[in-house]
Amino acid sequence: EVRQLPFENLYQIKDKKYDFIFSNFGGLNCTSQLNNVLKQLPALLNENGKIMLVIMPPVSIWEHLHIFSLNFKVAFRRWRKDGAEASVENVTFRSYYYSAKYIIKNLQPEMNILHMQGLCNIMPPEFMHHYLTNKPKLRKWLGKADSFLGGYFPFTQIGDYCIIVMRKKTCNEHQL
């Protein structure tokens, strides 16, 4: 069964448990109440259930490079505690940037980390791919370098996106 509802309303799901919960690219960045959302996730999972959360962390090398064009608003927007205005397909909303450490801290009592991967540390983000249109070899090399480095600290926790995969602890693991 697939259900779609706002993150803040996860408490409405009381009758089911799931094997896997997935948050699409940056979806969790749209709530200012992420700690409340994260607290609800373990209760929605079966034992050994997994989550895959894709967030936009506060550190994005490509956005920080805007400092060289003196565009400080873009270069540091992810560091704002009150979030930053964002727009997708002419819809404006507030986006909040959370660190992988924050998410893990809120979930670790109930969950184990399985994998982390940073995306777009070396490879430019999608909105900059037009610079690589006529450079397929460079694009391929950047993609491979990004995939490799994204699996190693500190690149696991930074980038345009960060993927965090966790598994719900078993009853035995809680007793340890």
Describe each PLM feature range.
Residues 50-80:
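Conserved class I S-adenosyl-L-methionine
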Residues 35-50:
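A short glycine-rich, Lys/Arg-flanked "PGG" loop and its adjoining helix->strand segment in the class I
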Residues 105, 115-176:
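A C-terminal cap/extension of S-adenosyl-L-methionine-dependent methyltransferases
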Residues 1-9:
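Conserved SAM-binding strand-loop segment of SAM-dependent methyltransferases
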Residues 19-34:
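A short SAM/SAH-binding and catalytic strip from SAM-dependent methyltransferases
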Residues 63, 85-102:
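Acceptor-substrate binding/catalytic loop of class I
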Residues 11-21:
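A short acidic, Gly/Pro-enriched loop at the edge of an enzyme's catalytic core
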